[in-house]
C-alpha cells in the first residue's frame, strides 16, 4: 500500500517538518523580521496535503501539527479497474461459482447428495417417464414440494438426474448381461426399473440379492428369502416398459366395472314354455361380479329351473340312497366352485346352454388385460421374442470369472456370503411360458395354429373327453377307447380347444379347455348314421391317411390365403361360430363373466339366451349298457364262459362298439391307425371281415389302443393295470375263426385295467409265481385227449434247456414228434400226436406222473392259468402252428379228471372256500397244504404212499416233481 501511495512523486521544495522550527505559517512574527519571506512560499504549497488521503491539519499557533489517515476512500478511487495479469486467473473460478441457475434455490456443493426419499422419487419418476431426464427432474421436484413446501430439500436439476441415472446403472450393470441386438436405452431401463423394484421390496440389498437381479430382468419374477420370509418380486408393469414394448396405446381408456348386469332370455319357445310351466319368469336379471365363473352361473339356473321329474328323483335319492345308482352323467369335475344346494344325484334333465343374443356385436377385445398386468409378458425375454432377436440375453453364457450355479446351494457359515452374481443360473425350462399379446400378431394367427394341429393331438383330446364319460360306468377299467389317426374337417373343428391363460385376471377372449357335450353329440349322431361296408373298409384303410393329409394341407393353404386377403379381421368365422354356439357345463371350463363382457358386453350389461340341449343317443346307449347283465355271445367268436367275467367281457365289447362307432367316420378308414399294428395279417383280417365279427374287431382295437396310448386316471398318474386273461382268450378265438397265422414268437400284450374287487382270489396266485418265469428248466407236459379213459396216466414229459422262457421258438407238432406241445380238442383225431408219443415210452416211467398236475405246466409260461375259465376250441389241423395256444395259457382245457384237479378240491370243500376268504393276503404253499391236510384226517401220516397221494391231489410241490423228473431222466439214460 505504501508503494501505491508513492506513485505520484513528492515535490522537492517541501521541507520536512523538523527542519522548520518556526511555526509562523499562518501569521507573521510579532517583530516583523523575516516573517513575510517565510510565509509566502508555505502558502503556495498548501494544496499538496491531499496526497496523504484524508488529512486533518490542526494549525495552532506555537504547537506542532500531526497528520493521521482516517479513511482511504480516495485511495480506492485511484486504483485501476483492470487488475494485473497475476490476479486474473483465480478470479475466473470465483465468478463461475457465483453463477446461479433459475431452478436452483440453494447453492449446493460440488458433489450432489441424494437422500433416501429423493432416490424413491427418482425411481418412481423413472417408472413413469423413462429416460426423459427433464421430466424426471420436474416430477422429483414436484413430489418434494408437495411433500413439504418448507423443507430443506435441494431440488434436482436435469444434469443431476442424468448423473445419478448413469452412476446407478454402472454400479449394477455388471450383474446383467444383454444381447448385442438390444439397444442401450432398453438395457438401462430394464436394469434400473427392476433394481428399483427390488430396492422397494427389500430393506437392505446385499450381494446375494444383486445376483438375482439377472433372473428378475430376464424372467420377470423372482422369490427372495429375507428375514425368514419368501418375498416375491415382479417386474412392474409401468408406463416406461409398456411404452418400450408398445403396449401402452389403449390401456388408459379401458375401465371395467366391478359388477355387470346379466340379462337372460329364452332362445326359443320350447325354453320359454319349459320355464313358464314351472310358474317362473322366463326372463331373468342378475348382477354378478366379473370374476364369477360361468359354470357356476349355469349350474345356478339349471338348479333353479329343473323339471318336476328331476325334483322327484332328488327326493327319492334322499329317501332311498341305496336304490339309485351313483352319478353317471355328472362328470364335470373340472370346476373349482361347487354349489352346495345341488344334490349329487344323476341329472335327468338335458344340459342347459347359454349363448349370446343374436345380433349382438362380437368384437375382438381392444386389449389383453393379462398381457398388461402380467410381469411375464413384459420381461426382457418376452421383449426380445417380440422384437425377433436371434440371440437372447438369457441364453448367453456366464460372465468371465463367474462360476456356474450348482443344483443346490452349499451350506456355508452365517458370516460368509457368495461373491459371484451368477451362482444360481436359472434353468431354461424353469422360465414360465411367455404370453403373446395382440400387438405381436393378429388374434386369429394363434388360433389357426391351434386348429391345424396334428391328428394325434386331436385323438388325445377325444380320448380325454370320452374317458371322463366312461369312468362313471360300473366297470370303467374294462372299457377302452380306440386311438384316432384320421379325422375329418368337421371333427377337427369341433375338437379344437382354445388355450386358457394361467393368470387369474380376466382373459382377452373366452377360452375352453374341454370338448363340448353338444359338439360330441353331433359327432356321434353323424358318425353312427351308417355302418361301413367291408369294401369301404378295405379301400378306406389304404387311402384314408393320404387323403386326410391332403385335406389338412389344402385346409391350411386355404386358411393362409384367406388370412392374406383379409388384413387382420376382427375374429375368424370359426371363433364366431364357436361363440355363437354357446357354453354348457361341459365346455365352460374356467371362463368368467368378465371374459364374456369383454367380448360382447357393453354399458355394464351382458345379454345371454338359454336353451336346453337335445338328449343325445350316447346317454341312451350308456344307460342300456348299465342294465345289461348277461348276454350270450356268438359261438363262432367266443366259446362258453363261466362266472361274472363273461358279463364283464360283453360289457367291454358293447361299450367299445358304442364308442368306436361314435368316434369313427362313416365313410373313411378304421377307427385306429393301421400303422401302429405290428401284424399285417391282423389288419387284413379285420379289414376283410364281415359284420358278424364286430366283436373281434373291437377286441383288436382295444388291444391296439392300450398298446399305443397310455391312459391316465383321475389322480394324474398312470396306474398299474392288471392283466385281463379274457382278452387273450377272445383274441385266440378270433385268430381261430379267421385263420390268421402268426410267427413262432409270442407277442407281448399289455394288460387291461380291471377292478381289484372283481378278480378271483385264486387268480391272484399268479402274481406270486411270476418270479419263476426266468428259470432255465422248462417243464412241458403233453396233454391228454378228452376221449381217453379217465384212469389213464399222464403222458411223458420232455425237459428242454432254454435260454429264455418267453421268446424261445416253439417247435411244430406232427404225428410222431415227442418234443412238442399238443393241444386237446373236441375231435378224436386231434390227440394223435400225444397218443403216438405216449406209446413210445416205457411203462415203468409213468408211475412218476401221478405226482404232477397242471401247475407244473404253467410254471414255465408267463402267467398262471385261468383256473375257473375253460374255453373249448376246435382245431382241425393238428400239424398247424400252435403258437396261439402257447401264447394264451388260459385257453387250455381243464385236463383234470375226477378228484385230480386242485380246483375241484378247492371248490368242493367249504373249509377251503373259507381259507380263500380268510387268507386272501396269504397265498403260501404251507398254508394251502395245512388246510388240505385237514380234509382227510383219517389217513395215516406215516404212510409214504398216502402222503404222496395227498401232495399229488391237492398241492404244488415243484421240488418233489423235479426230483422225480431227474430220477426219471437218470433211469432213461441207464436204459
Swiss-Prot record:
It is found in: Nucleus. Residues 86-98, 410-425 have a biased composition (Basic and acidic residues). Its main location: nucleus. The keyword Transcription applies. The keyword Flavoprotein does not apply. Residues 1-37, 71-111, 318-346, 403-450, 809-844 are annotated as: Disordered. GO terms for biological process: segment specification. One of its GO terms (cellular component) is nucleus. Keywords: Developmental protein, DNA-binding, Nucleus, Transcription, Transcription regulation. Residues 7-20 have a biased composition (Pro residues). Residues 109-173 form the SANT domain. Residues 815-833 have a biased composition (Low complexity). Residues 100-111 have a biased composition (Polar residues). GO terms for molecular function: chromatin binding; DNA binding. Polycomb group (Pc-G) genes are needed to maintain expression patterns of the homeotic selector genes of the Antennapedia (Antp-C) and Bithorax (Bx-C) complexes, and hence for the maintenance of segmental determination. Can act as a modifier of position effect variegation (PEV). Belongs to the cramped family. This is Protein cramped. It comes from Drosophila sechellia.
